[in-house]
Structures are given as C-alpha cells and as structure tokens.
Regions:
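Extracellular glycan-recognition regions
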Residues: 1-166
Length: 166
C-alpha cells in the first residue's frame, strides 16, 4: 500500500486508493490487477486470520485476506460493500475470476476472516466474534508452491476509504 501505518505493533491502517481492484476477465469482460496488498510469502500448509474494520463508502469497497500465487491464480476473501450493505465475499481466480457473496443482515463494526490451507485446498471462514467461525468457501489452490498471503483492499468505483486490519 502507498499510505499505511502500523499502530501499537498489531494494527495496520491503510488508505485504500480509488480505481483499485483485483478481478480477471469472466463475463464482466475486464481485468484489473492492482490495489494495496501487504503480504509475506509462505509455503506448505498454514492458517491466516485477520480482524477487518472498514469505513466503507461506495459500492464495491472491499478489504480482507488475499492468497496469491501469481496474477492468474489467487483468492481474496473479506467484506465487500454492495448497494449500501456489507457482504462476506470470496473471489477465486484461476485464469478467470468467480465471485461468491452473502449479504450480512446488519452492519457489524468488524469481521474476522480466516483462511486455512491444507495440501491443495483452502477453506475460508468468517466470524463476528473470533469464537464461532462459519465456512463460506472451499476451493482449490495449487500446492507445492509459495503463496503470497496478506491483507488487501480495493475501491473500484469510489474515492477511496480507510481499512483497519488487526
């Protein structure tokens, strides 16, 4: 990310800039592959978890976890703001992107997102309290190769927003 700050050693605050997104082809017919992505590279099996709090303003404002092998193979999961509502969302990309989304019945201040990689499978969960986790997606991701794992944000249509990760 261009503008970010680490507070109290455990909180990352980033300004998500306008005109950013991660999406490949599909029936929408466009590809965008740029946005803030703060990551470390891991191999083998792992679990990644983050608490996300967004100041969502415009439709498609989004933030969460990203697991990325390269520009054609990646997963992003988190909250996406659509038509004034928060949604838990996952996009899985293997050459083309797909999108699964479930509207939340309210607007929680924060959501926890967790990704668990076992061999060539990734399970994605969300939680409202960091205690009870609900599975939102299971998908394939090539095993035996390094994966960039980290925090992402995107603002395709708005002027940007502030994203907080813990």
């Amino acid at each position: 990310p261009q503008q970010w700050e680490i507070k109290d050693g455990k909180t990352l605050v980033m300004d998500v800039p306008a005109k950013t997104d991660f999406w490949r082809i599909s029936h929408y017919g466009f590809t965008v592959d740029h946005g803030p992505f703060y990551y470390a590279t891991y191999g083998g099996e792992f679990e990644a978890k983050v608490k996300i709090t967004g100041n969502y303003v415009t439709t498609f404002d989004q933030m969460g976890l990203m697991l990325r092998i390269d520009h054609e193979n990646w997963i992003k999961a988190g909250v996406e703001y659509v038509d004034g509502k928060q949604n838990v969302s996952a996009v899985v990309t293997h050459r083309t992107s797909d999108w699964s989304v479930v509207q939340l019945p309210d607007a929680p201040r924060s959501i926890w997102i967790k990704a668990v990689r076992r061999l060539d499978a990734v399970e994605i969960f969300f939680s409202r309290d960091d205690k009870e986790y609900i599975m939102m997606r299971t998908c394939w991701l090539q095993d035996n190769c390094p994966v960039m794992v980290g925090l992402m944000g995107a603002c395709p249509d708005g002027k940007g927003f502030t994203a907080t990760f813990e």
